[in-house]
């Protein structure tokens, strides 16, 4: 039986033999494409090439691209595990032509690979073409053994592809395989007639031959291109002769491993099988997402990861996995796929820790969610309701990850139904909000503003690695709205592009340069430099003298102090990264950075907050390398050679075949396009000013270098002197003096709490005499004097210990505010609950509140309404 790994290998080798460059899979996090949450197709990493914004050294490529589809039109998450072919993570095999070959070779290659390499039976293969694509049909007849009766013409919905409302588009041709008559869905079964699995699409060939404008008009592209995609999981199922992708070797190893953990059997019952398939699918997605730098959070990509972990964990509970297990199945993915994706092995320990921590967190969350649901059901029962409102079900789902079916199950056992329509309406609102919020960063807007320049093939030669000034010619001039102009006059703002520039455009976390550009007739101040594409640098300018004109020769000068300050911070960012890995471990990876002239910010993967000792060790390591004054070396080389040299490739970054390597002896080797010092000693000093958490598994260090670090040290010394004066202690005695004051403060606080407790206890004994009978219910409603809210709660606890059956309400005034607490004994909770009562009672004092069925608390702003509140409580009890 041919394995999935063998199919992947044969595919890439086949296209390499036909002149294609085998390109590495890009990250699941799209680089420079804020329109996408995840990489969801093989062509994503080549999008700028298809749009004419980028050029590569090759004109044909082949990839096995890792993809994730869990959002937008591809959001079929609830179907994963329930069908044979829905997945979150999958691999897309593809071949691409960038103005090289077109339809004929695309069809020839596909037919040859399927029938000669994979040896699929020719008599079972079919093709579809776009209804108007006579050329594609003739090419299939010419280069394959598919007869005319097995070639189907389809409409635009099925066989026409576009990148968006505008841009490259074209017809496509799908290859299908007949899986046999036993798969027939009925008398109307057939291609284009039904969606059953008899005629299974295995490969889609897209012929990009038009450029569509905003009106829908299509013009032929000067260089038509090819984009094809074939799902590895699907073609593996076909080659291995199994109906479901989950029955292939891709998934079976994970499924059987999970069976061993849960002591269950696959193919025993539908519920168990679904759970096993979900766990296998999600384990793959989770392992690759974390490896590509995505970490659990409550927004964006991190929220998707958290949902997948919780969904898989919940399905594990359904088959008896009550302990954490998902980190183990994710490690099984590493065992299976680590040879083809080495990054999985490199990050396996960290990945497993992140998953384990998220499992533990979800365990605690589930307990809280169950408690909340029980409280809500008790409140509903007391009020006589028989239906769980949709907002409660939604809150449980949104806050605790409780799927609707769990709420349904628990509610049904207690005799309740659930408002599913209300739940779905709130879910729809949330999705619409999320869709509106996901507009990405400003990168997309910046790139689109300068799209005309990119389409014209405009490029800038960057000379800033070696020079801070230089000469160039203005090749594009725009006003502040990025509209083409012939000149900028003094006081006007706009954008300027030169054929050569020493200005570094913001990228890789480093801020853009500032400076001046002068011509014989005028001068502009460069307030920022941006980089809408790898080969185009745009200066954001403000004219300060005379006029600056299109096509003028100009002198460009970068502000040296800011450039050098940025270089200090960028070099120290590399040193910090290396130091963190030495002190904390190799699991540390860069998760984001900011390099500005005045500071650096570095986000990195690490589970726990750093200790003071660890921070001090990292700071010492960086300063050790600074004081060693080690020269920096830069070199350009092939990506694979750089990796062999040990260069660090960063999460989420997209690298071309040739990369720039920045090396600091044996201390640090990274792929980097930024500007740096010539030697580490130029950094002067490195000072960490803060360490904090920014997301689950991601920490952040902010630091200063050079003069900024020196100024911070001087400021700290000044503050130390002030503290010494205030505490009447020498600098070396400050800590012991503060500790002494803290101890004294704790003693005084305990004395105050003891006095308050004594007063509270005394009130508790006395106010019990104020209890009255209201409609057969013992009611205590009393206004009390206490020092704080904690004392009020303590007093209520004292009252509850003496009130065997009844309702108590205590009110305390603090200035213009009032606090209320209501307690209901257990025997009365079928008639009254504390949250029910306090809602109406608190309204009398201008407040609101909530709590558990046995006790609820509220705050108000109208102390004068306390008597009315007590009266309201009596009326509620008396009916």
Curated annotation (Swiss-Prot):
InterPro entries: aa-tRNA-synth_II/BPL/LPL, Ala-tRNA-lgiase_IIc, Ala-tRNA-ligase_IIc_anticod-bd, Ala-tRNA-synth_IIc_core, Ala-tRNA-synth_IIc_N, Ala-tRNA_ligase, Ala_tRNA_ligase_euk/bac, DHHA1_dom
Annotated catalysed reactions: tRNA(Ala) + L-alanine + ATP = L-alanyl-tRNA(Ala) + AMP + diphosphate
Binding site for Zn(2+): 570, 574, 672, 676
Cofactor(s) for this UniProt protein: Zn(2+)
SUPFAM superfamilies xref list: Class II aaRS and biotin synthetases, Putative anticodon-binding domain of alanyl-tRNA synthetase (AlaRS), ThrRS/AlaRS common domain, Translation proteins
Subcellular location(s) of the protein: Cytoplasm
GO process terms (BP): alanyl-tRNA aminoacylation; negative regulation of DNA-templated transcription
Entry note about domains: Consists of three domains; the N-terminal catalytic domain, the editing domain and the C-terminal C-Ala domain. The editing domain removes incorrectly charged amino acids, while the C-Ala domain, along with tRNA(Ala), serves as a bridge to cooperatively bring together the editing and aminoacylation centers thus stimulating deacylation of misacylated tRNAs.
Role this protein plays: Catalyzes the attachment of alanine to tRNA(Ala) in a two-step reaction: alanine is first activated by ATP to form Ala-AMP and then transferred to the acceptor end of tRNA(Ala). Also edits incorrectly charged Ser-tRNA(Ala) and Gly-tRNA(Ala) via its editing domain.
Protein name: Alanine--tRNA ligase
Taxonomy of the source species: Bacteria, Pseudomonadati, Thermodesulfobacteriota, Desulfovibrionia, Desulfovibrionales
Gene transcribed to yield this protein: alaS
């Amino acid at each position: 039986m041919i394995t999935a790994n063998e199919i992947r290998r044969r595919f890439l080798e086949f296209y390499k033999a036909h002149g294609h460059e085998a390109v590495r899979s890009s990250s699941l996090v799209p680089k420079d494409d804020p329109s996408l949450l995840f990489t969801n197709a093989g062509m994503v990493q080549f999008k700028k090439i298809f749009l004419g914004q980028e050029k590569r050294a090759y004109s044909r490529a082949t990839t096995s691209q890792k993809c994730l589809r869990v959002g937008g039109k591809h959001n079929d998450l609830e179907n994963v595990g329930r069908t044979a072919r829905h997945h979150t993570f999958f691999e897309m095999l593809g071949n691409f032509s960038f103005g090289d070959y077109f339809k004929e070779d695309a069809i020839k290659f596909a037919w040859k690979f399927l029938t000669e390499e994979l040896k699929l039976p020719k008599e079972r293969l079919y093709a579809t073409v776009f209804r108007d694509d006579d050329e594609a049909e003739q090419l299939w007849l010419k280069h394959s053994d598919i007869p005319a009766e097995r070639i189907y013409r389809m409409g635009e919905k099925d066989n026409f592809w576009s990148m968006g409302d505008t841009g490259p588009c074209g017809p496509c041709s799908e290859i299908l395989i007949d899986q046999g008559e036993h798969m027939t869905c009925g008398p109307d079964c057939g291609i284009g007639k039904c969606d059953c699995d008899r005629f299974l699409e295995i490969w889609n060939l897209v012929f990009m031959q038009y450029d569509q404008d905003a009106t829908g008009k299509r013009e032929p592209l000067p260089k038509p291109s090819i984009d094809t995609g074939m799902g590895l999981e699907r073609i593996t199922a076909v080659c291995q002769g199994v109906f479901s992708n989950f029955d292939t070797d891709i998934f079976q190893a994970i499924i059987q491993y999970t069976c061993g953990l849960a002591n269950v059997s696959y193919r025993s019952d539908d519920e168990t099988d679904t759970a096993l398939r979900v766990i296998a699918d999600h384990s793959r997605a989770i392992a690759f997402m974390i490896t590509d730098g995505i970490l659990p959070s409550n927004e964006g990509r991190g929220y998707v990861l958290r949902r997948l972990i919780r969904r898989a964990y919940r399905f594990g509970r359904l088959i008896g996995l009550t302990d954490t297990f998902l980190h183990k199945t994710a490690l099984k993915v590493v065992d299976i796929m680590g040879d083809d994706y080495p990054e999985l092995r490199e990050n396996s320990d960290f990945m497993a820790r992140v998953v384990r921590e998220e499992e533990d967190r979800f365990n605690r969350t589930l307990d809280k969610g169950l408690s909340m649901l029980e409280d809500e059901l008790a409140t509903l029962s007391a009020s006589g309701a028989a239906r769980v409102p949709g907002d409660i079900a939604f809150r449980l789902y949104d806050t605790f990850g409780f799927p609707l079916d769990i709420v349904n199950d628990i509610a049904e056992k207690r005799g309740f139904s659930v408002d599913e329509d209300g739940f779905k309406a709130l879910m729809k609102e949330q999705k619409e909000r999320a869709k509106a919020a996901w507009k990405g960063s400003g990168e997309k807007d910046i790139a689109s503003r300068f799209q005309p320049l990119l389409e014209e093939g405009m490029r800038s030669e960057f000379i800033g690695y070696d020079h801070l000034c230089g000469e160039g010619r203005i090749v594009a001039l725009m006003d502040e709205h990025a509209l083409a102009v012939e000149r900028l006059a003094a006081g006007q703002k706009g954008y300027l592009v030169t054929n050569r520039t020493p200005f570094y455009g913001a990228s890789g976390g480093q801020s853009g340069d500032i400076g001046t550009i002068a011509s014989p007739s005028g001068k502009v101040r460069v307030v920022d430099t941006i980089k809408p594409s790898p080969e185009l640098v745009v200066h954001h300018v403000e004219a300060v003298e005379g006029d600056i004109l299109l096509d003028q020769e100009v002198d460009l000068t970068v502000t040296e102090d800011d450039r050098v300050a940025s270089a200090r911070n960028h070099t120290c960012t590399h040193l910090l990264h290396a130091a963190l890995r030495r002190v904390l471990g190799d699991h540390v990876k860069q998760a984001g950075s900011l390099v500005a002239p005045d500071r650096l910010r570095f986000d990195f993967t690490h589970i726990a907050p750093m200790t003071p000792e660890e921070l001090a060790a990292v700071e010492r390591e960086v300063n050790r390398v600074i004081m060693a004054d080690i020269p920096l070396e830069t070199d350009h080389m092939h990506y694979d050679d750089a990796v062999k040299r040990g260069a660090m490739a960063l999460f989420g970054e997209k690298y071309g075949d040739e990369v720039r390597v920045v090396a600091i002896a044996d201390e640090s080797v990274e792929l980097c396009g930024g500007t740096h010092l010539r030697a580490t000693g130029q950094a002067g000093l490195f000072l960490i000013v803060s360490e904090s958490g920014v997301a689950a598994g991601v920490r952040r260090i902010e630091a200063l270098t050079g003069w900024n670090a020196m100024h911070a040290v001087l400021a700290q010394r000044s503050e130390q002197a002030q503290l010494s004066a205030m505490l009447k202690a020498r600098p070396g005695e400050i800590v012991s003096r503060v500790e002494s004051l803290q101890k004294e403060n704790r003693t005084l606080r305990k004395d105050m709490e003891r006095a308050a407790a004594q007063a509270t206890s005394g009130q508790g004994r006395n106010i019990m005499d104020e209890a009255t009978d209201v409609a057969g219910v013992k009611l205590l409603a009393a206004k009390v004097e206490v020092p704080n809210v904690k004392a009020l709660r303590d007093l209520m606890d004292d009252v509850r210990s003496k009130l065997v059956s009844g309702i108590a309400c205590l009110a305390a005034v603090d200035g213009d505010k009032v606090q209320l607490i209501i307690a209901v004994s257990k025997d009365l909770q079928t008639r009254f609950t504390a949250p029910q009562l306090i809602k109406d009672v608190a309204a009398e004092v201008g407040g609101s509140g909530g709590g558990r069925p046995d006790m609820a608390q509220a705050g108000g702003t109208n102390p004068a309404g306390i008597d009315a509140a007590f009266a309201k409580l009596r009326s509620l009890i008396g009916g």
